Amino acid sequence: MEATKQVVNFGPGPAKLPHSVLLEIQKQLLDYRGLGISVLEMSHRSSDFAKIIGNTENLVRELLAVPNNYKVIFVQGGGSGQFSAVPLNLIGLKAGRSADYVVTGAWSAKAAEEAKKFGTVNIVHPKLGSYTKIPDPSTWNLNPDASYVYFCANETVHGVEFDFVPDVKGAVLVCDMSSNFLSRPVDVSKFGVIFAGAQKNVGSAGVTVVIVRDDLLGFSLRECPSVLDYKVQAGNNSLYNTPPCFSIYVMGMVLEWIKNNGGAAAMEKLSSIKSQMIYEIIDNSQGFYVCPVERQNRSRMNIPFRIGNAKGDEALEKRFLDKAVELNMISLKGHRSVGGIRASLYNAVTTEDVEKLAAFMKNFLEMHQL
C-alpha cells in the first residue's frame, strides 16, 4: 500500500530517494525477479548478486565515463572509513609519508585530522577563520614531495562547493565527492581516487563507492587493515568480505533512474535551477535570510542560512522549522555544529519540492518582515 502522507524530505543524508525507485524496491522486496527470495537474504556469492553488483558498477562507469584504467569498488565504513583508507593506501606512495590537504569545512577537517595518524599532513593554505569560502588556489602551498593532494568537493555542513577541479601540477588528486557525486559530469581522469557515500545522491546508507586508478594499487602501509586495502577489495571484486548487498542493489536502481532522467548533465542542470530558486529568495530578502557562504563558492547541494540576522534569531528559526513540519517539509534544521537552517537539494529532490519550500520561505518572510 502506498504511503498516504506526502512529506518533502530535505535531509542532508540519508536523503530522499526517487519515489519510483522506492515503489520498485517495495514491489521486489519479498520476491526478487521471481527467485522466491529477497535481495536482503541473497548470497553475495550467487550469480544473481553478481549480476546486481556488475550492473551497479557498469552504471557508475557509464554515467561518469570512467576510463578503463580505474577500478570501481564498493566498500563499507562510509566516507569516514575513507578518511583512514586514503592515507593507509596512498601516503606510502613517496618515502616522506606526507600529504597535502585543502580544508574548507567540517568533513575535510576531519579527514586531515585522521590522516595525521599515518603521516605528515600539510594544510596547503592558512587556517580559515570560518568555512565560508575556498581559498584562492594560486595561494596554495603544495608540497612537491606529498604523496597526494586531498579535497572535499562539497561540504555538507557549511555549504561550500568547488565548481572547479584544482590543478595540482600532476600530483595524485583525491576527492571526497560524497555529497555531490553524480550531480554533474566529472572528468575522472583528473583524479587518482574519488570516493562517495551513497546516501546523499545515489542511494541508501551502507555502501561507499571508490574509484581508484590502477597504478595506485599495491602501496598500502603494512598496518592497513585488509578490508580498507584498495588492492585487496579490487582483487576480490568488492567481495573480500560480505558487502552491503541491499545498499548496492538500491544504488543500482538509483543510478538507473539517473540514467533514465538524462544522466549527470541533466542532474547538473536541475541542481542549478533548484539551488538558484532558494538563493534568489535569500539574496532578495534584505537581510532576513542570510547565507554566510561567498557567492562563488555556494553549494548547489546544501544551502545553509540563518533567519533574522547573520547570527540567527533562534525563536524565528524554531518557528520556521515548526511551520515547515506542519506543511510536511522535514529535516531543514542546520547541522548541530552551526545551527540555523539547511536545505539539502540532492538529485531526488524535485523542482516541485523546491518550489514548495520557496513559496513557504516567501510567505514566512512576508509575515515576519518589519
Swiss-Prot record:
Write down which residues bear the modification named N6-acetyllysine: K51, K127, K269, K318, K323, K333
Q: Which cofactor does it need?
A: pyridoxal 5'-phosphate
| HAMAP family in UniProt | SerC_aminotrans_5
Q: What class of enzyme is it?
A: transferase
N6-(pyridoxal phosphate)lysine: residues carrying this PTM: K200
Q: List modified residues, type N-acetylmethionine.
A: M1
Assembly and interaction partners: Homodimer.
Query: Where does this protein hold pyridoxal 5'-phosphate?
Result: G79, W107, T156, D176, Q199, N241, T242
Q: Which GO terms describe its cellular component?
A: cytosol
Q: Which family does it belong to?
A: Belongs to the class-V pyridoxal-phosphate-dependent aminotransferase family. SerC subfamily.
Q: Which reaction does it catalyse?
A: O-phospho-L-serine + 2-oxoglutarate = 3-phosphooxypyruvate + L-glutamate
Named from the GO MF annotations, one term is: identical protein binding
The molecule here is called Phosphoserine aminotransferase
Q: Could you tell me the keywords of this UniProt record? A: Acetylation, Amino-acid biosynthesis, Aminotransferase, Phosphoprotein, Pyridoxal phosphate, Serine biosynthesis, Transferase
A Gene Ontology biological process in which this protein takes part is: L-serine biosynthetic process
The membrane spanning regions, by residue number, are none
